[in-house]
C-alpha cells in the first residue's frame, strides 16, 4: 500500500523539464516526504519542493555546483522583512554566486517573480539568477558595472574560478 501511494503521487506530479533523477521518498502519517540531500533531512513533498529538489540535482549533476556550496531556504533580511531564497550557491571562497527562485509547476513566472529574486540580489549581489517553475527556466547574468540584467541561454558549468 505504501509503495502504491508513493507511486500514485509521483505519477500525479508534473513531469518537469529536467533530466530524470532518483529521489528518496517516503510516507509519514500524513505526508509524502522527500530526502533533501543539501539539508540532510526529509522535507514535505509539495509541488514547489518537487521543483526545488530537481533543481538541486540539476545544479549538482549537470552544472557541477557542489551540494556543499548550496544553501536552501536560508534566511535573508530585507529591510525589516525576513525572506528565504530557494537556493543560494557559494563559490569556493564563500561568496554567493547564484540565486534560484522556484515555483510550483502550476504557477506562472511573472514580473513579480523576477522582482522577488531581484530583491534578494540587492543583498547578495550574485552574478547569476535563475527562476523556474520546473517547466520553464529563465537564466540571467547580472552586470553590476552597467547595472543591467541580460537573459542567457543556460548557466555556466561551476569551476574553481566561478
Predicted regions and their residues:
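Intrinsically disordered regions, especially transient/low-confidence alpha-helical propensity segments
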Residues: 1-3, 47
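A short, conserved, highly charged catalytic patch centered on acidic carboxylates
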Residues: 13-128, 135-162
